[in-house]
Amino acid sequence: MKLLRNHVFWTVLSVFFACSQLQAGTLVLSSKFVNDNKDRATITVQLEVDEHLTHAHKIDKGGDDGDVHMAGRADEVRLPLVAEILNAAKETSSMQVLNQSSPASKIAVKGVWRLWFEHPSPNQMIQGNTVAKPINSNPDHVFEIHPITQFGNNSVVDSFVPIANKTTHYTAYPAATAFPKYEALKSTIKNNGSAISITSTKAGYNYAEFIIELAAKPTAVSDGFLVLAKIFDVSDEEEPVVSDLRRMVFVKGTPPSDALNGLGKGDHLHVMGIPRVNLTEVLAAAKAGKTVNTRLPYEMIIVAVFPE
């Protein structure tokens, strides 16, 4: 009976949002998932790894970011997903586990949940629909576990440092380039009570380098810290690149979280971060039964702090 109710729920959901405007991509999430994860940094899943790279990307700029991609399926997410290890070449034990894995096996994975419309499907992505087995390591998706913090029995929190190898340092996007792009993203949000639809223009600019000025003392959550901050380009710490405050996400036990310890209002950090959809703001913007057109709410996952 429970399976029947779930099938009916997701069928009704598909019909309800069938007429949603398709721009670059439309994602439909269960309201429970949004409420459960909106103020969390991470998610834990049993990941069936279907496709993966066998070695890390080279390090340069843009997509040459030193990550390793894997695509798979997880009952906890029920969406096409890609998981990524930061500074993967340094995580030799995790790379060994990945390369020895078989598609039939599942690996316990914990990491930062991330929704971002960089690689959306042309079709609606409805949480709970059957997820097709991916045919490569970077299929159409908007859900990621990125960066991973635990891969099998291996902790990889030490990967949350500037991306580099012995000869090369990664060049992230300057704040003056990336943040105007984030701010320009448009979205349509619709809430029917049991599910929330987000339609967004296509996004990009994965890694940005910037200065943050904390607007308050960080708030502790179960798996990290959240804090509002002003955002500056490294070349100009006088004029913020965004007129409003934006939320920063720090993962407990990582070097960025350690660097945050003891800081408060007015303190600065030189960081690298990646954007994700801010589900707290999505929920606040959503009006039951109404369509809301707004900028795409986003926040920044802090993946590294640069030494001063």
Where are these regions (language model features)?
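Intrinsic disorder/low-complexity segments enriched in polar/small residues
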Residues: L3, L22-A24
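Bacterial N-terminal signal peptides that target proteins for export
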Residues: M1-T11
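OB-fold and OB-like single-stranded nucleic-acid-recognition modules
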Residues: G25-E308
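Bacterial N-terminal signal peptides
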Residues: W10-S20
